[in-house]
Amino acid sequence: VPKYKKEIPISQLLIDKNPKSLIAESFRTIRTNLQFVDNTAGAKTIAITSTISGEGKTFVAINLAGIISFSGKRVIILDLDMRKPKIHLGFGVENIRGMSTLLIGKDDLESCIQHSTLPGLHFVTAGPIPPNPSELIISAKMSELLDGLKSMYDIILIDNPPVGLV
């Protein structure tokens, strides 16, 4: 994927603004390659991560999800980077409820799913920053959530926290 950071202040959906751009074509190539990795039937879960913050995980997650939705697939992005959430910024929405409130049982899934401007592309923001994000992510509730989403979406795309020090 070509470097875009200097031209945009935050990670945002770009592939819909110029579908024939180099960046959109790069994401199409990734989408096509992913189809060859696993062509079995059923919903797929894709995790996006990197070693440190600021390497473009959210940018990749948002635009890859967008290009996949262009192909007619139902896609949902989950913001699991609960220490430095950015999905809400990319879509220009507030981060009042989301994965943190969903996983503690404060909100239900229906109230946390938000719709993007692209048909078939939905997302769940991280929600308020919890004191214990890793415990929420490894909880049984998270496994149940993923199982439930597999019946609603073709692709579950997870914007993970970096794997290095945060």
For the regions a language model picked out, list residue spans one by one.
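Interdomain "pre-motor" coupling segment immediately N-terminal to P-loop NTPase/helicase cores
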Residues: 1-7
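P-loop NTP-binding module
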Residues: 5, 12-166
